[in-house]
């Protein structure tokens, strides 16, 4: 049994529920049988990957849905071996080079070279080029991005790149200038409510409009998250009620408890406990940027106006350090330690002011 988010994923540009004008423009783009390199960007859950797969379906037909998982070993110049997993069809290859860490440059060069020099197996839908889909391009190192820029020029005749990322701010200008940028905005609350109602109707369920609206708001306009929460509500309780509780993910609850622990006590022992909790989140593959953002959001609830500005500025500083460094736990712990010192001083100054 597949999840609703996969079961009802649109397969063609005509089936998309929102941003239909953009879908029509994308269809016109690929109808000629060719297109430039694309840079598709937008927030999580906006539908970037769905639109990319619809473009490939429009270009190559149903054969693009016959996917296989491949494991490849790439040897770096220093003789280090890197294991990388890819998803491929006869027409395209999907890879996340940032999985290779600091060796992402070698992965990009080898992958693009292999794809560009290989021939397609099915001649019925033969095109002059194959497509390489690179995800999380904004997480690539600068060396990898410069290598990508050189490689995309070299193999333009036999290979088209579709780059996918959340933000273009971390993509170097030479890559941005060589791609057609396609921004996929987050769906509106009304769009999400419409999709939730449509999916529930196909499942034979009656979804109250009030609950659909609450799900859309709680998901922060992330359609994937809204569908997953709706399915969780279905498992938890049916028939639906307008005021039923919407279950939260375990890591969100755990992060809130961690923030409460930071606020309740500021000692070296508590800092050690919080470090362990942060490690727990990282080992469960919660991205450090999400942890930082979630911690900041929860901690700001316990700060007054003056302190909020200082804490937000401090979080921005350590988030920047997080991007530059390779050990996330150092920067997360440094942020927590700095907040503890700032918050403790703020509370002590407040108590002194109350003593006449």
From Swiss-Prot:
It comes from the Eukaryota. GO terms for cellular component: Ctf18 RFC-like complex; DNA replication factor C complex; nucleus. It is found in: Nucleus. One of its GO terms (molecular function) is DNA binding. The modification N6-acetyllysine is found at residue 20. Keywords: Acetylation, DNA replication, DNA-binding, Nucleus, Phosphoprotein. CDD domains: AAA (cd00009). The modification Phosphoserine is found at residue 125. InterPro entries: AAA+_ATPase, DNA_pol3_clamp-load_cplx_C, DNA_Rep/Repair_Clamp_Loader, P-loop_NTPase. SMART domains: AAA (SM00382). Gene3D superfamilies: 1.10.8.60, 1.20.272.10, P-loop containing nucleotide triphosphate hydrolases. GO terms for biological process: DNA repair; DNA-templated DNA replication; positive regulation of DNA-directed DNA polymerase activity. Pfam families: DNA_pol3_delta2, RCF1-5-like_lid, RFC_C. Subunit of the replication factor C (RFC) complex which acts during elongation of primed DNA templates by DNA polymerases delta and epsilon, and is necessary for ATP-dependent loading of proliferating cell nuclear antigen (PCNA) onto primed DNA. Belongs to the activator 1 small subunits family. Subunit of the RFC complex, an heteropentameric complex consisting of a large subunit RFC1 and four small subunits RFC2, RFC3, RFC4 and RFC5; the RFC complex interacts with PCNA. Forms an heterotetrameric complex with RFC2, RFC4 and RFC5; this complex has ATPase activity but is not stimulated by PCNA. The heterotetramer of subunits RFC2, RFC3, RFC4 and RFC5 interacts with RAD17. Interacts with CNTD1; this interaction facilitates crossover formation. This is Replication factor C subunit 3. It comes from Bos taurus (Bovine). The gene is RFC3.
């Amino acid at each position: 049994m597949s999840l609703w988010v996969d079961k009802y994923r649109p397969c063609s540009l005509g089936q998309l529920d929102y941003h239909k004008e953009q879908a029509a423009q994308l269809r016109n783009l690929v109808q000629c049988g060719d297109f430039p390199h694309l840079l598709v960007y937008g927030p999580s859950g906006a539908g970037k990957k769905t639109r990319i797969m619809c473009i490939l379906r429009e270009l190559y037909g149903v054969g693009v849905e016959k996917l296989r998982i491949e494991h490849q070993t790439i040897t770096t110049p220093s003789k280090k071996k890197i294991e990388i997993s890819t998803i491929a069809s006869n027409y395209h290859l999907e890879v996340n080079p940032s999985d290779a860490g600091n060796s992402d440059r070698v992965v990009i060069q080898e992958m693009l070279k292999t794809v560009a020099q290989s021939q397609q197996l099915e001649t019925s839908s033969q095109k002059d080029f194959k497509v390489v889909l690179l995800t999380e391009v904004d997480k690539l190192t600068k060396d990898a991005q410069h290598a990508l820029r050189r490689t995309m020029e070299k193999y333009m005749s036999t290979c088209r790149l579709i780059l996918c990322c959340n933000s273009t701010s971390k993509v170097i200008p030479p890559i941005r200038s060589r791609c057609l940028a396609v921004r996929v905005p987050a769906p509106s609350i009304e769009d999400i409510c419409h999709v939730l109602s449509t999916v529930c109707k196909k499942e034979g369920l009656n979804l109250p409009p009030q609950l659909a609206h609450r799900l859309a708001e709680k998901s922060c306009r992330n359609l994937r998250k809204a569908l997953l929460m709706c399915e969780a509500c279905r498992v938890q309780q049916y028939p639906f009620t307008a005021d039923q509780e919407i279950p939260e993910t375990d890591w969100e609850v755990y992060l809130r408890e961690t923030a409460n622990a930071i606020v309740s006590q500021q000692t070296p022992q508590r800092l050690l406990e919080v470090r362990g909790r942060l490690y727990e989140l990282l080992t469960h593959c919660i991205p450090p940027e999400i942890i930082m953002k979630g911690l900041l959001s929860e901690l700001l609830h316990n700060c007054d106006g003056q302190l909020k500005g200082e804490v937000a500025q401090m979080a921005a500083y350590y988030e920047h350090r997080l991007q530059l460094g390779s050990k996330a736990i150092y920067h997360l712990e440094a942020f927590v330690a700095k907040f503890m010192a700032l918050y403790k001083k703020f509370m002590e100054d407040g108590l002194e002011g109350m003593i006449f």
